[in-house]
Amino acid sequence: MMLYECGIRYERTMPNGMSKKVTELYLVDACSFAEAEGRITKEMEPYISGDFDVVTIKRTNYSEIVENGADSADKWFKAKLMFVTFDEKTSKEKKQAVYFIVKASDINNAHTVVVQHMKTSFVDYEIATLDETKIMDLFRYEVNTTSSNG
């Protein structure tokens, strides 16, 4: 599976009663662009009254989804980690960039969540960047476990 970033454009009623076209970003776990479009359309239908358009779909480079599980975690952060390895052929340190999508309440919490997540890893790493994204939510792929044994 791969995460796709989908942009949804729709008309939202603002607090002052006026309507305004807005675009929101969501992540969808899917196998292809076509599946990502179908899934985001299905996921958004219950939440948006009226028409909406899927205006963008792009692949992301996230290798892991890291969540802290707290109800207060309502923001998504992009973490760039540098995995540090030793190349025995050249006798030099090598750094490889790896990207995580992290759900947390704020940037300090996101840092803590990444550190906690990496405690079980044997890889040396550095957190190179940690930035808040405009992503509203993530829709994971769910396997249908119900069977129909007639």
Which residues does each predicted region cover?
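Short, low-order "capping/linker" segments at domain edges
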Residues: 66-72, 139-150
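Short aromatic-glycine-(Arg/Gly/Cys) micro-motifs in beta-strand/loop hairpins
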Residues: 1-21, 72-95
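Mixed-charge, glycine-accented linear interaction segment located at domain edges/termini
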Residues: 99-139
